[in-house]
């Protein structure tokens, strides 16, 4: 008997097929995407309203009462603002949500996404340092952008430099 491993030609490996009659579940409807987007945007807009009141010099208790949130939420926003310019930066996800909510046109969203200075995920020791390109992948997976839109953005980003892994 020969103990040499057999060379596998991947073309010979059969690809499993779904059971006969099976169809994938339908994606979310535009109405469902809109509802989810509105809920997510409400949180973002509230965070930015809290930031504006902090910049205007309001104290935490007054902001909490005005916004209907716990004082601890205001403190978290204030602490993030001390270490970063904003606690709630604009992201590719937000642009997708704004389009789904009807707050932004298809053209405006795509113009912004085409010119976005993307960063890409990398492995850092035993963790993943996510980049904002992951937001675009998420938007596609959840149905917020079409295959065609994703393909156009991917073609733009294919030539962009990727961050090296740190192992």
Predicted regions: what is each one?
Residues 2-167:
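Acidic, Ser/Pro/Thr-rich low-complexity regulatory regions
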């Amino acid at each position: 008997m020969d103990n040499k491993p057999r060379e596998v030609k991947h073309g010979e490996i059969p690809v499993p097929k779904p059971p006969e009659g099976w169809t994938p579940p339908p994606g979310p409807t535009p109405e469902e995407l809109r509802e989810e987007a509105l809920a997510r945007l409400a949180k973002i807009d509230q965070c930015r309203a809290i930031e504006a009141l902090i910049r205007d010099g309001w104290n935490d208790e007054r902001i909490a009462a005005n916004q209907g949130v716990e004082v601890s939420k205001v403190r978290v926003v204030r602490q993030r603002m001390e270490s970063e310019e904003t606690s709630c930066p604009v992201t590719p996800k937000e642009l997708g949500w704004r389009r789904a909510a009807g707050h932004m046109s298809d053209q405006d969203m795509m113009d912004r996404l085409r010119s976005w200075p993307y960063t890409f995920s990398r492995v850092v020791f035993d963790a993943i340092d996510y980049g904002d390109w992951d937001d675009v992948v998420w938007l596609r997976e959840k149905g917020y952008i079409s295959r065609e839109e994703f393909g156009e953005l991917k073609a733009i980003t294919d030539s962009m430099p990727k961050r090296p892994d740190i192992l």
